[in-house]
Amino acid sequence: NQKYINVPKIRRRRFKVVLDCVNGAGAYSMPLLLKRLGCEVIEMNCERTGIFPRLPEPIPENLKATMQSVKKHKTDIGIVVDPDVDRLVLITEKGEPFGEENTITQAVKFYLSKKKGNTVVNLSTTRAVDDVASEYNCKVFRSAVGEANVVEKMKGVKAVIGGEGSGGVILPKIVFGRDALTGTAIMLQHLLEFGGKM
């Protein structure tokens, strides 16, 4: 939603990014998105083979080479997606995992700062989301674990944003499903507005 994502400003910032798509579906769309946002992209595991070069779960123990690459290339951020591009994992400029729970929390913070409304997360997502929502006098509703449950609840309470602590961001204005491309655009805009460091 370009109302909240300032594409020209992101392009001017020229973020330097390590991108790891585990040779999954993201290898088609993620490099294209980042390049259109003016990022300098260092691609890792972005071959369109569907053959995973490492264990595909985007957890720190599987991302050691990606974290080292962020440090080596002195990038602003590392962006990792899972094979079907619904989960987003970020790596700080220091080469440290940002934490999937932090991703959903910061995405909610950014979006509620632009558009107030209800948020839905699952029962296992961090309570930090509630703290962020309360800053904007917004309500958080909880659903059972699972994307379908979160989406159903979002529709029921007309939520403006939702997701899960696993790094899945759901923005109904874009799609009623977890979407790492949407999460990436939100997080780059968030970085831009809050100083460029995580």
What would you call each of these model-derived segments?
Residues 1-194:
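Phosphate-binding chemistry for phosphorylated carbohydrates and sugar-nucleotides
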Residues 196-198:
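Mid-to-C-terminal polyanion-binding domains and interfaces
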